[in-house]
UniProtKB/Swiss-Prot annotation:
Chief site of localization: cytoplasm
Protein name according to UniProt: Enolase
InterPro entries reported in the protein's UniProt record: Enolase-like_C_sf (IPR036849), Enolase_C (IPR020810)
Species assigned in the record: Clostridioides difficile (Peptoclostridium difficile)
Domain of life: Bacteria
Chain's role: Catalyzes the reversible conversion of 2-phosphoglycerate (2-PG) into phosphoenolpyruvate (PEP). It is essential for the degradation of carbohydrates via glycolysis.
GO terms for biological process, alphabetical: glycolytic process
Keywords assigned by UniProt, alphabetized: Cytoplasm, Glycolysis, Lyase, Magnesium, Metal-binding, Secreted
The protein's required cofactors: Mg(2+)
GO terms assigned for molecular function: metal ion binding; phosphopyruvate hydratase activity
Length: 57
């Protein structure tokens, strides 16, 4: 049953033009950019990326 659900979901995601890439653990890998925006964490992520870039200099 699990395999059928997995393949059905992959088909639905493909039909809707959504990402259907699979992560290491076997689950679908989401589009993190849109999820970050929807959750309201864009400013936090931007700040951390800027801080990380400063460390690389």
């Amino acid at each position: 049953m699990g395999a059928e659900v997995f393949h059905s979901l992959k088909k639905v995601l493909g039909e809707k033009g959504l990402a259907s890439g699979v992560g290491d653990e076997g689950g679908f890998a989401p589009n993190l950019g849109s999820n970050i925006r929807r959750a309201g964490y864009t400013a936090v992520i931007s700040h951390r990326v800027a801080k990380y870039n400063q460390l690389l200099r």
